[in-house]
Structures are given as C-alpha cells and as structure tokens.
Design a protein with these regions (language model features):
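Glycine- (often His-adjacent) and acidic-residue-rich active-site loop
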Residues: 4, 55-93, 109, 137-139
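Crotonase-fold acyl-CoA enzyme core
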Residues: 92-163
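Acidic-histidine catalytic/liganding microenvironments
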Residues: 45, 72, 97-98
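Hydrophobic alpha-helical membrane-association signature
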Residues: 31-34, 83-86, 116
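Conserved CoA-thioester-binding segment of acyl-CoA-metabolizing enzymes
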Residues: 1-56, 92
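Short, glycine/charged-enriched secondary-structure capping and boundary segments
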Residues: 22, 30-31, 65-69, 116-119, ...
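Terminal peptide-recognition signature
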Residues: 16, 20, 35, 53, ...
Length: 163
C-alpha cells in the first residue's frame, strides 16, 4: 500500500486527507511516515497555523489494514514492532505538535483510526460519525495510544466498555 496521504493547504491550514477509500482509508506504515513528514513540514512553516486530518469518501478510517496486520503476524517480532512503532511515531507527533491538530471525522473512525482521532487536540464529527475501538473483534489489543487517551478523556467505566 502506498502512502495515500494527501497534503494540501487551505489558507493557513494544512489539510491531511487519508486517501484510500477502496480500503476504507486503512492505515499503514507508509501513511504513518508520510504523516510524520507532513507534520514536520507544517511545524517548520510559519504560514501554517493549524492542521486538519480528515478522510476521503465519507470515511475517516477503518484503522489498520487487516490483511497487512494478519500477514505481519507471520513476520519476525522485530518486523512487527517496527510497524507498530510507525503508528506510535505519528500519534506522538500529533500529540506533541505545537499547533492545533483537528480531526474532521465523517463516517467510521475505527481501531487505529479512532486512536488517530483521539490524538488530535479537537475532534469535529459529522452526524454520521461512528467511533469504535474494534480491536477485540479482530483479536488485537488497542494500539496507537487509544486506551491511554480514552482513560483520560472519559470516566474509567465508560472507557473500559469501549475498549
């Protein structure tokens, strides 16, 4: 899967569009790296005052590409760790970004897509938005800091229910 992260500028805002609608804007290592690179460019550009992350085709993100995740299970632990580190690097870059980062969510934000939205300073959601952790339904544990974020944004009991 190629990066499929489109970076545009609208006024003083950098817009990062997850552009992989045929796979429900699934995330992957190339997209993680492109996201970090785009944030580095936005940080060094004094004309950019904010970043918006959105998805193409009425979908924010279904999270990780399950086919890739399943094939990763056959890889050496180091390869698996490298893939997870890419996501965590992007999440950390969002969390520590010195300018506001806004998730503009339309449709589903699931799994790592939900974690990505939670890393942002603000989530603006359309009336058709759906937020779901989804990890346990595919026998995975939450990644991307989703469990950490949820436990700090809402009561523990509700966060536990969502996880």
């Amino acid at each position: 899967m190629t990066a499929r992260l489109i970076s545009t500028t609208e006024g003083q805002t950098m817009v990062l569009t997850l552009s992989n609608p045929e796979h429900r804007n699934a995330l992957g290592p190339e997209m993680y790296a492109a996201g970090v690179e785009a944030l580095n460019a936005a940080e060094s550009n004094p004309e950019i005052r904010s970043v918006v992350i959105t998805g193409e085709g009425g979908i924010f993100s279904a999270g990780g590409n399950l086919q890739r995740l399943l094939s990763n299970r056959q890889q050496a632990p180091e390869v698996q760790a490298q893939s997870i580190e890419g996501l965590h690097s992007w999440i950390e870059a969002i969390r520590t970004f010195p300018k506001p980062v806004i998730a503009a969510v339309e449709g589903p934000a699931a799994g790592a897509g939900f974690s990505l939205a939670l890393a942002c300073d603000l989530i603006v959601s359309a009336s058709n938005s759906v937020f779901v952790m989804a990890y346990t339904s595919v026998a995975l544990s939450p990644d991307g800091g989703g469990s950490w974020s949820l436990s700090r944004l809402m009561p523990r009991q509700l966060a536990t229910e969502l996880l």
